[in-house]
Design a protein with these regions (language model features):
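N-terminal targeting or regulatory segments adjacent to alpha/beta-hydrolase or S9 domains
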Residues: 7-13, 19-61, 65, 298-299
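Serine-hydrolase catalytic machinery in alpha/beta-hydrolase-like enzymes
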Residues: 39-65, 69-74, 79-84, 88, ...
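Primarily recognizes the serine-hydrolase "nucleophile elbow" in alpha/beta-hydrolase
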Residues: 143-219
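C-terminal catalytic histidine-bearing segment of alpha/beta-hydrolase fold enzymes
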Residues: 249-299
Length: 299
């Protein structure tokens, strides 16, 4: 059984709700043939609520989903004249309980679409709380989310010709728990078709469930990392530790620690702080990594 639940959090959200979906691409099943023996099942699934949002956010909304058992995805495509051939698999955060689909998914796709980058936003399976039951352990849950993220990469590779993207320039990244998921996938051994060319990790959660010893024996993609110094949910210490591990293992990496920007700043549009420069700095980094050459996508 599936039910959508909506909780309005302020008058501006009611206005935004009327326009929801106007510029969003089609939502598609990540696993159209179903997931065999899917361990993630909810009596009430795909529950949605709305949260306050940044008026300058590209999506103009902030929907948050929980109890996701049937993962889906959305593809954002740039116009042909802007297309750089670079693509991203975007993993929104939400502590694995939720998916902040607009703030850390659609907003990213909409923004980078204008800069010539294709984005596939994944609404992956969640480890949401069910009354009277304990949540799965991270060890039990994580392989399911990793499988969803990996399928996002494989979809882009399979559709590379139709999407006019370079299969060797597919990046993977995410926000908060989505950043943790991206790192976990990059550390996993799922075959070349599921490995990204680079990663982007925005205030990633790095507190547990990651074995950095693997970096000594397995390649890790070049990484772009962003975090705010005031962040208490995903503290700077975790990013510093991870960055140090990457450097020690000679993985090309760039870390940006901003003096302002608490957890969940997303694109940081309209903050007036240096934090809002990270999305364009990411484009510069892609040029440094020779993923983007010049011209289209220039920020």
């Amino acid at each position: 059984m599936s039910r959508n639940a909506s909780k309005i959090a302020g008058p501006c959200l009611a206005i935004a709700s009327a326009a929801l979906g106007a510029d969003f691409p089609e939502e598609q099943l990540l696993w159209p043939n179903g997931i065999e023996n899917n361990p993630i099942v909810y009596e009430e699934s795909n529950i949605m609520r709305e949260e306050a949002f940044n008026p300058q956010a590209p999506s103009g909304s902030c929907r948050v989903y929980s109890h996701v058992a049937e993962p889906t995805f959305f593809i954002y495509r740039p116009t042909p004249e802007k297309n750089t051939g670079v693509s991203l698999v975007v993993l929104p955060g939400g502590g694995y309980r939720d998916i902040w689909l607009d703030k850390e998914g659609h907003d990213i796709g909409l923004y980078y679409q204008e800069l010539g980058i294709t984005s596939l936003v994944v609404k992956y399976r969640t480890n949401s709380q069910v009354e009277g039951k304990e949540r799965m352990s991270l060890e039990t849950y994580l392989p399911n989310a990793i499988a969803d993220a990996a399928e996002g990469i494989r979809i882009l590779r399979r559709q590379a010709k139709d999407l006019n993207i370079d299969p060797k320039k597919i990046g993977l990244g995410g926000f908060s728990a989505g950043g943790h998921l991206a790192i976990a996938l990059c550390l996993a051994d799922l075959g070349d078709d599921a490995q990204p060319a680079f990663s982007f990790l925005i205030y990633p959660w790095i507190q547990e469930g990651l074995d950095f010893e693997i970096l000594k024996s397995r390649p890790f993609p070049p990484s772009f990392i962003v975090v705010g110094q005031p962040d208490k949910l995903t503290p700077v210490d975790g990013c510093l530790l991870f960055y140090g591990e990457l450097c020690e293992n000679k993985v090309p990496a760039e870390l940006h620690v901003y003096g302002k920007g608490d957890h969940g700043f997303s694109l940081a549009h309209g903050t007036g702080h240096s934090t809002e420069k990270w999305p364009s700095t990411f484009i510069d980094w892609l040029r440094d990594m020779e993923m983007i050459e010049s011209g289209p996508g220039k920020g």
